[in-house]
C-alpha cells in the first residue's frame, strides 16, 4: 500500500502533506485569528503564503473530527469549475489518508461538491463517500439557487474577496444573501474571507464598518464589535512568512514598489503621475472634493499662468487633511444622496459647467496626484462609484 500511495502522489502531481515542527513558521498559521472566536475572519496577506492551504486543512480536519462540512465561495462561476478546483485539496491527501484510517486517498469534485474517494493504481474511483465534505458556490450566479438548502455547513471560505479589476454590482448584499442561503437558521458557522494585499480600499471594508485597515501593521489582528450585537469581525494583515522569502529575494527583488506585495505582503499600488511643475495659487481655477471610503480628497483644476505651460489644464488631487466647511456652492462628489445641486454622486451628473469640465479632464486622464496612495483612492472611487477604469 505504501508503494501505491507514493505512485498516486506522483500521478496526481502533489507531494504528500507531511507537517513538520517548522511548518507554522514557514507558512501562514491560522491559530491566532481562530483564537479571537470572531464570526467573520478576514485574512489578508502576500501571495502563496498558505492562507487557502490552512483553511482547507481546517475544513478537512473539521469533517473527520467533528462531522462538520465546509463551503468554498468565489466571485465568478468560472472559478469553481472542475478545471479550476479539482486540485484544491490535493495538498492534504496524506492528511485525508491518515484521518480516514486509510479509507480515502483522493478527492472527487463534481456538481459543485467535493467528496472523499478511493482510487486504484490506474486512477479509477473504486469507492466514494456519499456525503460531500465541502460544497462550492459563486456569488454572480447565487440568485439561481436562492433558498436552496444544501445541508449544514460550518466553515465557509470566500477566497480572493479583494480584487483590482472591479466588483459585482451590489456585491456585498449578494454575498450576504448567499451566506443566508448557506447558513439559514444555524448559529455555528464561521466565515473566512481570504485575499492577497491587492487593494486596501476594498468596498467590503466600508460595508462591514472596518475602519483604519490601512493602519494595520503586518502580523496584527484587529477585532471589531458592533454594539450589543453578537457579531464580531477579526481582520489579520499577515506577517511575512519564511517560505516565500528566498523565492521573493531571488526572483522579485527589482526596484519597483508594486512588487512589494509579492516580496513582503505590502499593499499593492500603482505608480501615479505627479504634477509636472510647482502649482501656484493663481494657477488654480476651480476646487472640488471627493468623498470616498472614509477619505476626503481635495481636487484642483489647474491652468498654468506660466507662458511655457499656458495650454496645460489638469486636475491635481491630494488628501484633505484639515477640516473644511463645504457650502452649497462647492462642487463635491459624495457617496450618498444629497439634496444640494452641487453635491452629486456620479460624474455623469453635470448640473454646471464646472462639473462638465471635471468630467472632460478625467476622461482625458488629465489627472495627477500628490502621492501613490491618493492615486489608489481616486482609482477605486472611479472604478467602484463611477464604473470607470482608467488605470
Tell what function each PLM region has.
Residues 2-391:
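Phosphate/NTP-binding elements of NTP-utilizing enzymes
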Amino acid at each position: 500500500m505504501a508503494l501505491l500511495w507514493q505512485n498516486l502522489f506522483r500521478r496526481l502531481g502533489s507531494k504528500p502533506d507531511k507537517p513538520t515542527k517548522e511548518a507554522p513558521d514557514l507558512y501562514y498559521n491560522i491559530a491566532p485569528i481562530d483564537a479571537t472566536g470572531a464570526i467573520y475572519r478576514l485574512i489578508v496577506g502576500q501571495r502563496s503564503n498558505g492562507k487557502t492551504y490552512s483553511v482547507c486543512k481546517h475544513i478537512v480536519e473539521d469533517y473527520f473530527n467533528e462531522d462538520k462540512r465546509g463551503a468554498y465561495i468565489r466571485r465568478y462561476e468560472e472559478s469553481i469549475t472542475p478545471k479550476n478546483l479539482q486540485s484544491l485539496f490535493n495538498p492534504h491527501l496524506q492528511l485525508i489518508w491518515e484521518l480516514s484510517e486509510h479509507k480515502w486517498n483522493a478527492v472527487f469534485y463534481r456538481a459543485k461538491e467535493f467528496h472523499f474517494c478511493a482510487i486504484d493504481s490506474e486512477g479509477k474511483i473504486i469507492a466514494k463517500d456519499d456525503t460531500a465534505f465541502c460544497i462550492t458556490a459563486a456569488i454572480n450566479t447565487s440568485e439561481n439557487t436562492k433558498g436552496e438548502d444544501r445541508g449544514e455547513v460550518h466553515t465557509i471560505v470566500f477566497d480572493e474577496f479583494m480584487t483590482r479589476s472591479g466588483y459585482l454590482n451590489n456585491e456585498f448584499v449578494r454575498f450576504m444573501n448567499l451566506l443566508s442561503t448557506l447558513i439559514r437558521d444555524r448559529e455555528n458557522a464561521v466565515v473566512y474571507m481570504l485575499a492577497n494585499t491587492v487593494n486596501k480600499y476594498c468596498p467590503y471594508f466600508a460595508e462591514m464598518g472596518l475602519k483604519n485597515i490601512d493602519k494595520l501593521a503586518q502580523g496584527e489582528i484587529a477585532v471589531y464589535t458592533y454594539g450589543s450585537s453578537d457579531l464580531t469581525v477579526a481582520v489579520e494583515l499577515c506577517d511575512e512568512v519564511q517560505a516565500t522569502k528566498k523565492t521573493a529575494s531571488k526572483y522579485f527583488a527589482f526596484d519597483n514598489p508594486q512588487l512589494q506585495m509579492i516580496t513582503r505582503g505590502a499593499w499593492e499600488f500603482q505608480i501615479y503621475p505627479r504634477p509636472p511643475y510647482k502649482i501656484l495659487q493663481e494657477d488654480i481655477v476651480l476646487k472640488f472634493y471627493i468623498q470616498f471610503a472614509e477619505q476626503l480628497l481635495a481636487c484642483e483644476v489647474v491652468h498654468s499662468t506660466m507662458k511655457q505651460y499656458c495650454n496645460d489644464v489638469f486636475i491635481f488631487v491630494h488628501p484633505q487633511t484639515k477640516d473644511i466647511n463645504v457650502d452649497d456652492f462647492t462642487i463635491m462628489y459624495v457617496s450618498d444622496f444629497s439634496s444640494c445641486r452641487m453635491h452629486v454622486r456620479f460624474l455623469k451628473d453635470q448640473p454646471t459647467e464646472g462639473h462638465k469640465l471635471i468630467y472632460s479632464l478625467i476622461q482625458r486622464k488629465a489627472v495627477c496626484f500628490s502621492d501613490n496612495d491618493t492615486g489608489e483612492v481616486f482609482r477605486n472611487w472611479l472604478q467602484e462609484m463611477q464604473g470607470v477604469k482608467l488605470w
